[in-house]
Amino acid sequence: MNYISKIISIQLKSKLQSAIIVLLFILVFSIDNSGMGIGFHTSRIGHAESTDGINFKRISVPVLYPGNDSQKEFEWPGGCEDPRVAVTQNGMYVIFYTQWNRKLPRLGVATSTDLIHWEKHGPIFEKAYHGKYFNMATKSASILTKMDGEKQVIAKINGKYWLYWGEHHVYAATSSNLVDWQPVENKNGKLKELISPRKGFFDSDLTECSPPALITKKGILLVYNGKNKSGDEGDRRYSPDSYCAGQVLFDLKDPSKPIARLDVPFLRPMETFEKSGQYINGTVFIEGMVFFKKKWFLYYCCADSRVGVAVYDPSNPGQADPVILNSGKDK
């Protein structure tokens, strides 16, 4: 079976041998050649590891995949897609992924202690509000995390676990057990939209959640994928229908309240391999970010065909994107 490495999520793990060796593990979202076109393949999630964050060795079999199990009705024939993984302080890994049966995408959750053997728990909104959101299309989850020394771990806020999620808008959900989640609603009993697409900006079509959100001194940082709309409603500085990466900051006391948002992307398709493949309009689709060896490694999908990495060194920042430097100019 031919696999195309696609989108990834990452996590750190320490391994004791003759000394402590820090390994970087990634979960690779791969698609086979059973179908033609985006959305018609069968997706599986694999496992790879690295000692430098750049060169990876992966095992030959998937670790999370559509099987003959309790989730078959949600995952056959489309599979398991778009993984986002984080870890609790006691070492339990939690993965949120899209269960795709080619009819309706649903956010699913699974847990593991070794990143290899996963226990599926099913759709995360199945029990919420008596199943109100069970048959609604849901995907793309970014759980709230914090830094514990140099390790990024799942965090609570106001006594609850917090999750940003959504593709067309950014929504939120809370949980007490990491498995059963309750969407945050507005006073009218509908999903509360935290941020939405903006006319004339790089995220004019979609604002899709990406890696786990991170508590910082200034607020909660959520990096997300923005899709540029074609025509007059999009940002003419970027290709129509292209995917770029944005940032939004939420209030620490009220995690549903945005307090700052970039008007231009901090990562955009520029290289040839980011503009060729299954999605030729240009795609840098971020899904995994980790603090590794005192640097931030951001892993992203290149045109739905390859996996790339961008590295930020806080001690030696690189040159800013010229679009950001000139962001005050007319569009």
Regions found by a protein language model. Give the residues of each.
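Donor nucleotide-activated moiety binding/catalytic core segment of transferases
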Residues: 203-209, 282-285
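Acidic-residue sensor for enzyme active/binding pockets
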Residues: 81
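Active-site/ligand-binding surface loops and adjacent short beta/alpha elements
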Residues: 212
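Short glycine-rich, acidic/polar surface loops and turns
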Residues: 274-276, 284-287
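Beta-rich carbohydrate-recognition and catalytic domains
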Residues: 1-15, 19-78, 87-205, 215-279, ...
